[in-house]
Amino acid sequence: MTPLLELKDIRRSYPAGDEQVEVLKGITLDIYAGEMVAIVGASGSGKSTLMNILGCLDKATSGTYRVAGQDVATLDADALAQLRREHFGFIFQRYHLLSHLTAEQNVEVPAVYAGLERKQRLLRAQELLQRLGLEDRTEYYPAQLSGGQQQRVSIARALMNGGQVILADEPTGALDSHSGEEVMAILHQLRDRGHMVIIVTHDPQVAAQAERVIEIRDGEIVRNPPAIEKVNVAGGTEPVVNTVSGWRQFVSGFNEALTMAWRALAANKMRTLLTMLGIIIGIASVVSIVVVGDAAKQMVLADIRSIGTNTIDVYPGKDFGDDDPQYQQALKYDDLIAIQKQPWVASATPAVSQNLRLRYNNVDVAASANGVSGDYFNVYGMTFSEGNTFNQEQLNGRAQVVVLDSNTRRQLFPHKADVVGEVILVGNMPARVIGVAEEKQSMFGSSKVLRVWLPYSTMSGRVMGQSWLNSITVRVKEGFDSAEAEQQLTRLLSLRHGKKDFFTWNMDGVLKTVEKTTRTLQLFLTLVAVISLVVGGIGVMNIMLVSVTERTREIGIRMAVGARASDVLQQFLIEAVLVCLVGGALGITLSLLIAFTLQLFLPGWEIGFSPLALLLAFLCSTATGILFGWLPARNAARLDPVDALVRE
């Protein structure tokens, strides 16, 4: 009969400084299916090292080890993990159950890595626990179970994927005599069902219950009686689980990794919350700055637009402050008519102005009187709370009519409900009120100067007695480039005047400058917020590194029951991403609260959350989890299963 496990001249040595210490010295051993074998020896004899090699947790330095005819030395790490999943079941002295999982969930772990569907996995775990007398303890956590019950859960876990070979390391070492007898009885039952049972022990009473006792001393086998031939041993073995494959296996594996990651995080709620805190603050900072910064920018731009955007002002002279008399009369009414005929002009309004006294009954105030056309109010986006603007007949006839701003109305008519039709003195000229321009609220504050507007023909001919204009304001048609319009306007007037005796002021340039400035400031603040997010990410990495250290034994257990390095990497990476995503969701919630609070104190601001801001937050959370979770996850995946199992 061909042996199931075949070892030939197995040697295992470990470095000790500059030397190599040989722990196993030429072990040759055959073990057959259905055998119950005990490996005995004193501490340091090499029996645990031999068991690790038998269970494919460790590799021999030299020699040949075959499992069902397959040479283990030719297998890579993933193939060894598959071999452990499909052929071996481990029973440890200290049970090695995962404390944050129930008995049922602990039993399911090997099948999770085998890719068994959840429903089948659950039924299989319940069946095994029922067979071992734990049907009423399926939802109990390890801390709620006795030592004997924990060891039975460990046995059920070993059988989950079939457990053709049961490797029991001191299975009764931590149990009282009664519980120890129960465990040994179960191992005998497994032997009777066709399992190969290998017990590593130093207890002679336990070893005596095996059919074959192999003694190892100083790394060499000193006693190895012949095997007892078995008949029909395969007839009663456990069924090997049937797994899904392809895309379904990937989806199932990812879902299970997500579930296990959530359970691990839920087991340490306070630490998880503190880990999230940096991410919460970072995401809240990024989202709040993006959203509030955008609201502030829109508020500033709205105020600038209220002054008049897409407009070009033309003034006489070389620049602001130029009072050279030869330039004061540069702008004429003919210039206004020529400008209005240009195809890119939506409207053009002249302006002449002078500071005058306004009088009504016994009220006397100073104000700025401005001669404009009816288009002036459209150019500057102003609306009327009472009355209306000038019509063409009033402009042509130099009508004695006036439009007040809201501040002037309050000064002259504090108690009147309707002021249209009232007559006031503008300087020494009586003028009938035909409208009140609505005051525009601005974050820059309102002007303290009282202002009134008259037809420019009236202002020039009746009030000031001048034939030239102080300025012309041109509104450019939508869709036409403002800079190009400014160039054409300059070219037109220069040709008409024969020289450049004027200058222009383009509000669109101011708007673009403000947009650039606010964008730069917002970028700077966002970078500051991103720094806080990076600090939070470093916190996640630190905690995950600590978590890997604390959970080293758990990683060893998972590898022993069949987890591949990629499975471990995936789980810890998902944990890091999950922390960051939940932290990101809480950060977005916090930013909503911040925005809501700001909205209460700043009612004029329109604070809204764009899909872009939320997408940015989601991507930041995910990227932070992947970036700062990679190193801890990689460290976990690189752990040696033997070292991980023995580490405290």
From Swiss-Prot:
Its EC number is 7.6.2.-. It comes from Shigella boydii serotype 4 (strain Sb227). It is found in: Cell inner membrane. One of its GO terms (cellular component) is plasma membrane. One of its GO terms (molecular function) is transmembrane transporter activity. ATP binds at residues 41-48. The chain crosses the membrane at residues 273-293, 523-543, 576-596, 600-620. It is a multi-pass membrane protein. Its main location: membrane. Keywords: Antibiotic resistance, ATP-binding, Cell inner membrane, Cell membrane, Membrane, Nucleotide-binding, Translocase, Transmembrane, Transmembrane helix, Transport. Homodimer. Part of the tripartite efflux system MacAB-TolC, which is composed of an inner membrane transporter, MacB, a periplasmic membrane fusion protein, MacA, and an outer membrane component, TolC. The complex forms a large protein conduit and can translocate molecules across both the inner and outer membranes. Interacts with MacA. It comes from the Bacteria. The gene is macB. It is an enzyme of class 7 (translocase). This is Macrolide export ATP-binding/permease protein MacB. GO terms for biological process: response to antibiotic. Residues 5-243 form the ABC transporter domain. Part of the tripartite efflux system MacAB-TolC. MacB is a non-canonical ABC transporter that contains transmembrane domains (TMD), which form a pore in the inner membrane, and an ATP-binding domain (NBD), which is responsible for energy generation. Confers resistance against macrolides. The lineage of its organism: Bacteria, Pseudomonadati, Pseudomonadota, Gammaproteobacteria, Enterobacterales. Belongs to the ABC transporter superfamily. Macrolide exporter (TC 3.A.1.122) family.
